[in-house]
Structures are given as structure tokens and as C-alpha cells.
Amino acid sequence: MNDELPDVQAGFRQGRRTRGQIANISWIIGKSKEFQKNIYFCFIDYTKAFDCAHHTKMWKILKEMGIPDHLTCLLRNVYAGQGATVRTGHGTTDQFQIGKGVCQGSILSPCLFNLYSEYIIGNAGLDEAQAGINIAGRNINNLRCAEDIMFTAESEEEIMSLLMKVKKESEKVGLKLI
């Protein structure tokens, strides 16, 4: 699954950390000063991102991203029939079904969420977007660390355009921006 993710996604990937993304932001700022370009940043986060990934949408996304059917089937079996109860001071509730969210503590969950996030970014068209900052022949308009996304562009209008595209695609798969 690691091959499916671009360099701009550092979340839960071997050899990549938040510190690296901070260094990238610092590099972008330095290059924008060097080339005398305006630079704008917008940092976004999702409300309960890992809890809101819909299972049925997740299976569809995995299929569309070319994840082999046998792997998706295994994942579906892991998530099938999940239930929970809540214990309070007055007793325990009846069991209820869980139809969204990735399994807390599972080593697969970050990978699944990264693919979910990649689907959103791809459908928002950020890979092809002209918005961003062009440094050394490369257009950079976002950096990601799991569910946290940073947009960068040369104008407020470009930032708003990127934000609105991602907001729209996120809502289609059940995620809301904070």
C-alpha cells in the first residue's frame, strides 16, 4: 500500500515523520523568499477522522484504487459484524453495530486511512491543480501527515480553491473539516 501514496503523505510511513514535513515547510518558506514569491498556508484537520471513515465507502475506495479483491475481502471480514457496548454507572447498553471508523490500535488502520485520504485528494484534483507554489520545476500545493493537511499557494484565492475542493470531496465520503 505504501507504493500507492505520494511523497507528500508522511503519516504512518516508514522513514517519514512530522519532523520531515516541518522541514519541508521550512524549505518552501526559504525558497519562496529566495525567489521572492508570496506564500500562503492553510492547515486543516478533520473532525474525528479515524472514527468517521464509512466501511462501505472504504471498500469502494480500495477497489477504485486497485487494491486486489482478495485483500479487500480479508479487510471486510475483519470489519464485518463489529459491535460494541457502553458501560455506564447504570449498567451496560445492548450491543450495537459499528459501520464506520477504522479499528483503534490496528496496524492496518493508518494505512487504510491514508488510502481514504489519498482518494479524497485525488478526486479533488490537487495533483493536477495549477494552484500551489512552483519551486525548482515542481508544483507543491499540499503536504500531509495522516489526516492533517497543509495547503500552500501563492494567493488567498488559490488556497480557498484548494480548501473548497477538498472540503467537497471529504464530505462525499463522510468526513468534515474542523
Language-model segment annotations:
Residues M1-I178:
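Nucleotidyl polymerases of mobile genetic elements and RNA viruses
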